[in-house]
Every structure is written in structure tokens, then in C-alpha cells.
């Protein structure tokens, strides 16, 4: 029986872990084994890549656990957390986030509505055993969206001994009244490993150190220093099976993550003080709110034979996001929906992913890897409002990577990749807006420009990535790395075809269907000194982006009724250092 307790000024994390093994070990031998395996494994992983690598295993994740994976990693240099209220967060690497970094779990890139500033990461933080963070251009291996880096969640490794094991974890925070827990049970028998986990968290309204805020030039009161209706919860379940026998290994994972979070009504639409009065309940979730359910099924297949490693990753994801708000319309001709009248926005994203990798070790000096990826997406919409159109998206790419090891101290790596992508966007006509603009006296040219909230778009993209780097260990405890890489990113559908008021940010966001893909060059170097229990890391990087896509304020009000400033997707050269 092992008990772990970590406390802090803002929160408490308590973990109870029990492990019944068929083969018994002494405490001394177990501790020694963990130290030796962890140290050699981390050192080997750092030497395998020319990019800056951070590797975190279960002990680190437990010590810094917050109930939120991104917040757990926010103290890592170069990694930041964009917090969305008390419960959800989005990751950033070296200042890049959203669709400019990739999050991978069990070999499959996480695909949700990550373009939204108020959309969190749908991953159970309790269910993470090991995390690897690659900083820098990673499009070579991971394709588009990995310009800034990758957060890779690795699967649980078997201990190669028959055992029953389990974990019970409790989480509590004084700020926002967070309470949560997780229960995991598993069995390892011969070549099989099976694990089941259930997790749940609840948190109250968000506490702030002020009594008023300014919203749309109006002073809005904050009663009890709590942002009303910002409570939320998440409920997650997952099952994982792993099989390893001689030259073959595989795993299958099924997970479902459900999250629900309220929106502060004082910053939703036109300011209304009456909606902010204290209801004496800091945990209820009323309108407006958002909810998302993320279902994911993945499998990894791997075969080893005579210096050849063939692996495949296949996955299906269904991200169902809804935003609810009391039915309101600025058009007297728009009729309230008969079913679910308060469901404002619906996004249903289906994603099919597959990848194949072939690794060849022709000698002790040369190693080659070839790979192919494919992804198919289909997004459907619903609700009484419009923000993003329906679309279909297809991407595929192939790469080649070669590593030459001169000796045990020096290795050089280089590779190239080419991707093709196609996106088909469905048109969306808004007759209610047309009638409204006629009544307001707008010119016919303006009316026709806004008749179609989304125009039909069928575009194809192609681009390449490349990378070259060196890893040098001149002496024990010293590690030097340098890498130069070119990466790219296909424009997102929100950048091409969004056209509506997004209540999460309360601005009119309008896409541009003529945008081309982003390209970027990045050079980074690092030096690591490891001496006994001390480790010193010095790293630097410089980035240059061509056709960097961003939301540009137009300096004019939207023609949509009761809207706000208009922001349009635009592209420009930019440099980050």
C-alpha cells in the first residue's frame, strides 16, 4: 500500500495506490529499479531527437497535479496555460497555440474545435501516465498544426509481471471549491494488460479579487466576488487493453470525455444587471452554457523483425459541442425552434485518422524512417444561430527521415515531408438577415454581400516541411542540440469561412476564403548540463513566419444586429524570437 499526499496554498491532491502482485519484491529492489530505468530511458529519448525535448513521468505529474493536464505542465519552460474559467485550459508552446501546436494521445492527434479561445482540451488529466513535449517545428512527423511543437501523451507500459493494481485519487481546491476524484482498476496477466478508469470533477463559480468589472464601457457588479454561472464539471471514462508477444505488440483505447461549463451572463450579449443578482448557489449551471462530449477510439499496431519496425496508428473521434443560450433573435420573422429552442450553436465533428511508419536500422550508424498519414473530417452544424459552416476536410502526407550516428557522441538527422489537403465548405444563406438589412436601409450591394453568411469553397492545398539537426554529447553529462526546420499549417475553417458573433469572445469573426497556408522557419539550440542531482538547461530559438494568419480588427461595427466590432482573418509576415 502506498499513500501520496501533496498540499499547497490553493489546493490539495491526495492519491491512494494499491498494487497486489503475484511476484513479490522488496521495497529496496523496487526503488532501485525505478531509478535506473527512468534515468536511462530519459537520456535515450533526449538523444533520439534534435528538437528540445521535455519528458515527464507519473511521479512528476502527481507532484504537480491540478486536475487539469495543461495547468499541470504550465511550469515547464516554454509551455503556457490559457485558462478558461476554473476548469478548462488550452496549451501554448513558445507563444503558439490553438491550431499551431498538436496534442497527440496514443499516437492519434486530438481533434476537437480547438480553434475557439473558450474551448478547452478534452482529455482526462487523471488518465495520463507519461507526457513528452517537443518544442519547435514538428510538422515533419505530425503534419499540419504542429508548427510550434507537440504534446504527446504516451500509453501505460506493462511491468511484465502478473499483478492486480488500482488507484484511487481525490482532488480538492479551496479556490472555486473544486472537488473531484478518479478510480482505476487494472490487471496484467502474461502478455495482456487491461485498465479501466472513471473520473469526475466539479467546481464552483470563479472567484475574482474585484467587486466590479467594465464590459462594453459599462460598470458591471460582481456580487460576492464570484462570477455568476461560471461553475462546471467533467465526467470521464476510459478502457485500455495492451498485448505484447515476441515480435508483435498492440493496444486499443476507448475514452469518453464530457464537460459542461457556464458562461458569465454579465459578458454575454447586451449588459443586463438584473441577470447578475446573486442566486445564492455557486455550483448551479444556468443559461448560457456550453457542453462538449468527446468520444475517441484508437489502436496502435507494431511488428518488429530483423531491424525492421512497422507500426500503424488508427483512430476515430467524435467531438459534439453545443452552446446554449435563451432563445433570442433580432429578426421578428425568425421563429423559435419547436425542439430545443435554447440551443444556439451545435458542432458535430467526425475525424478518421490513420498513419503508417516503417523504421529501418541498416547498420549501427544508419537509421531510416518513412511514414504516411491520412485524415478525413466531416463537420455538421445546428442551432438557431450561425458561426461556422458545414465542411469536409481531407489531408494526407508522406515523409522520410534519416539519422546518421558517427559514434556514440555525435548524430545528424535530416528529413523532408510533403502534404496535400482539400477542403469543401458548404454555403449558408441567411434570409432573416437579408430582410433585416432591407428594413435598416442598407444598399443592395451590402445586402447581397451578407446574404450568404458562408460561400461555397472547394480548395486544394499543398506544402512541404523539412528539418535538419545535430545531437552532440562531447562528454558525460553534456548534451548539445541544434535544429533548423521549415513547417506549415493549412488554414482552419474558422479562418476561411466563419461569419458570426462568437459569444465566447463576443466579437464578429469573419473568415477569408482566399487565404493560403502559413509557412514558418525556426532555428533552435540547447545545451544541457547534468551533474549529480542538478540539471542546467540553456535554450534559445528564433522563428520567422510567412503568411501568418490572425484576426485583424477592422475598426468598424458589424452590420449584424446587436453585434460588436468586426474582426477579419488576415495574413502577414511575422517574426517571433
Placement of each model-derived feature along the sequence:
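Short, acidic, small-residue-rich periplasmic hinge/interaction motif at the N-terminus
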Residues: 21-62
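Extracytoplasmic beta-strand/coil segments of soluble accessory domains associated
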Residues: 70-109
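Short acidic/polar hinge/loop motifs at secondary-structure boundaries
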Residues: 109-135
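Outer-membrane beta-barrel translocator/receptor signature
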Residues: 112-114, 127-129, 140-210, 231-235, ...
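Outer-membrane beta-barrel signature, preferentially recognizing the C-terminal barrel domain
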Residues: 169, 174, 278, 282-296, ...
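Transmembrane beta-barrel wall of Gram-negative outer-membrane proteins
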Residues: 176-202, 215-264, 293-295, 299-305, ...
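Flexible loop and strand-edge segments within Gram-negative outer membrane beta-barrel domains
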Residues: 228-234, 248-303, 318-350, 378-379, ...
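Single conserved hydrophobic/aromatic residue that forms the stacking wall/gate
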Residues: 567-577
